[in-house]
Amino acid sequence: MDFISLYRLNLRFINAGGKAKYLLRLPSLSKIQKLLKKNQEIIVNRKHDTIYICGLGPSLADVDLDIVADKEADTLVVNHFFKMAEQTKLRPTYYLMADTGFMKCKHIAAFNKAIEMYKDSTFVWNTSFLKINPEVLDYDCKKIFIATSNGYYISPKKIDITKVMPAFGNVICAAIAFAIGAGYKKIVLLGCDFNSFAFPHEIHCYDGGKENKAARRISLDFELFCYSFDASVHVQLAEYAKSLGIDIINSTRGSLIDAYP
């Protein structure tokens, strides 16, 4: 068996595991579906056709986000963007945090900090948060939920944010999927370097970029292995967006994502 066959087999195993998880969660799906139906309001009330998605790659440190803030467009940021607050006046339309790690003790402070600093943004959270901490439903902030547990996004298929969707890989894949599902016609990527596997230390826009010497939390080989699947999801998302007439433009300088122009 060659490497390509092994790679495709891995994708099938991941997808099968996700489908099994989805079936196991069916008994509790009714509560989730009520939350997801509320996302229809996002689609109906969307004010602009363009959205800027800001990753946290080192290149974002060189972007004047104040210019983005002044554009007639919506914005979406992710994860630890709050650490960039002192560098920009940007108040994002959406703040996506999908990793259940944010519900763990060592990360909950960061989660709460983001909520405290961006009260005027709409937070987009994973429904899996509710299993770990049901109280997030009552947090004092604007929030919606997405569910990404129905298999893996291994081929272009309909994206519907009012229903349980497949898993999309890393947070930027999920952000793009959300933007497509919300009905945006033009999606612009900033700070989506997609290159952390190419450095011996962790790199982000908020902690020194390429000069940062923070210790890695996972090995280079495992991160590259994971990125191979994320790269595949980007290709599928690009094909799906194209079929809908949606433009995805990667404006990240030096980005290693090759799925978008």
Predicted regions and their residues:
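Metal-ion/cofactor- or nucleotide/acyl-coenzyme-handling active-site neighborhoods
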Residues: 2-261
